[in-house]
A protein has these predicted regions:
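Alpha/beta enzyme core
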Residues: 19-27, 43-78, 82-100, 112-269, ...
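Glycine-rich oxoanion-binding loops at beta->alpha junctions
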Residues: 85, 105, 369
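Generic N-terminal amphipathic, Lys/Arg-enriched alpha-helix
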Residues: 2-14, 19-35
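Short, conserved beta-strand segments within well-ordered enzyme catalytic domains
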Residues: 37-39, 59-63, 104-106
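C-terminal alpha-helical cap/extension of soluble enzyme domains
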Residues: 4-9, 290-391
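Glycine-rich beta-to-alpha transition loops that act as phosphate-gripper elements at the mouths
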Residues: 40, 106-111, 271-281
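Active-site environment of divalent metal-dependent phosphoester hydrolases
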Residues: 223-225, 280-282, 305
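Internal helical hairpin/lid segments
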Residues: 269, 275-298
Length: 391
């Protein structure tokens, strides 16, 4: 499970440098595997994701959505840049305690209406960091142009790609629409969920294949956000192969310039691809998509359910104790403090009390990290070529 790239290239820090992230993505495309990109919404879920990666001994990506970024800043502040920087600061500090893995930080699904208040300011912040000789806070950002016409999508992508080069970050784009709902941004389940080889050619012509800046492309092949009954989601992973092959043949025929030598990284796979909306997908569909150049696979719905099950399980198992905090009499002050101090709940009593958030919250990282790890374990049992650590 090695790629020949040595750990420790980033000076011992667990968060990837730009160079390290580029190595990770190239190694995945060349080796036929993908990194899980786990969405988190709190320090609890962030810790759980780190724990899951460490236990599986897998490098990976941790990301926040538009709602997650705002939530990290607090309900009253409600600022996505503040929340993103708070998330990243916590991640940098805690991830350093996991020296056996490398983690990249990513912002997920930034639609057009959020660009000016989220990704553009973050890219400007990171460009200033680079000017000072520092590493950027994040390693990649996603521009979600799936709701605008392709021409406008690529106009904005071109602008953001130029900014990403200055920020030493990677851009992720989405071509086509992913069905279902993601942070209030939704699309119907219909034929628009399928990208085309012609769109692949257009993307390569407009954005290049690495010579103008590094990017990942989420071409859609029937992907749907959320969890659905079997048969509702009709994935066509072979579309990814058609897109890759069409562009690769154009390069070989001299019809498409390739100054960055994208085919040298992985023959027949000029694009580094992203898999969105994978919850409920069959293992063979995931394996097929990864074999066609997927290097990043988003995981959100699955882990949200793992989190909520742990919460519900504790509450229902300790129903009377949770409601009757002090014998038969509820203590409103104590209830309030439990809600506001959260992780500082050790101040309120011993961890063996059912209503203590120590008991309550300690069940969440184990449950959630186990769910994160279960996807990673698939690689090592030979079910899916999905994840791999670079060592």
């Amino acid at each position: 499970m090695t790629s020949g790239i040595g750990l420790g290239d980033n000076g011992g820090m667990t968060i990837a440098t730009p160079e390290r992230y580029a190595q990770m993505l190239d190694a995945a495309r060349r080796g036929g595997y993908a990194y899980p990109a786990i969405n988190v919404t709190s320090t609890q879920t962030l810790n759980a994701a780190l724990q899951g990666f460490a236990e599986a001994e897998s490098d990976g990506i941790i990301q926040v959505s538009v709602g997650g970024a705002a939530y990290f800043s607090g309900q009253r502040v409600n600022d996505r840049v503040t929340g993103s920087l708070a998330f990243a600061a916590f991640a940098h500090e805690v991830a350093a305690k996991y020296p056996n893995i490398t983690i990249a930080l990513h912002t997920d699904h930034c639609a057009k209406q959020y660009l000016d208040e989220w990704v553009r300011p973050l890219l400007a912040h990171e460009a200033e960091q680079v000017k000072r000789g520092e590493e950027p806070t994040f390693q990649s950002h996603m521009w979600d142009g799936s709701t605008v016409p392709l021409e406008e999508n690529l106009d904005i992508a071109s602008e953001l790609l130029e900014k990403s080069v200055k920020a030493h970050t990677v851009l992720e784009i989405e071509i086509g629409a992913v069905g279902g709902e993601e942070d209030g941004h939704s699309a119907e389940i219909n034929d628009k969920l399928y990208s085309t080889p012609a769109q692949g050619i257009t993307v390569a012509q407009r954005l290049g294949l690495g010579e103008r800046g590094r990017y990942m492309a989420a071409f859609t092949f029937g992907n749907v956000h959320g969890a659905y009954k079997p048969g509702v989601v009709k994935l066509r992973p072979e579309l990814l192969d058609e897109i890759q092959t069409t562009v690769a043949l154009a390069i070989k025929a001299g019809e498409m310039p390739d100054p960055a030598h994208s085919l040298d990284v992985a023959p027949g796979k000029p694009f580094a691809l992203v898999f969105h909306g994978g919850s409920g997908s069959a293992p063979e569909e995931i394996a097929q998509a990864v074999s066609y150049g997927v290097v990043k696979m988003n995981i959100d719905t699955d882990t949200q359910y793992a989190f909520s099950r742990a919460v519900a399980g504790h509450m229902f198992s300790n129903y009377d104790s949770v409601l009757k905090i002090d014998g038969e009499v509820g203590n409103k002050k104590l209830c309030f403090r439990l809600r506001t101090v959260s992780g500082e709940s050790f101040m309120l009593g011993s961890g063996d009390r059912p209503y203590s958030l120590i008991t309550f919250t300690d069940t969440i990282p184990d449950t959630l990290s186990s769910r994160c790890g279960s996807a990673m374990v698939a690689t090592y049992t030979g079910i899916l070529p999905l994840l791999r650590i670079i060592d």
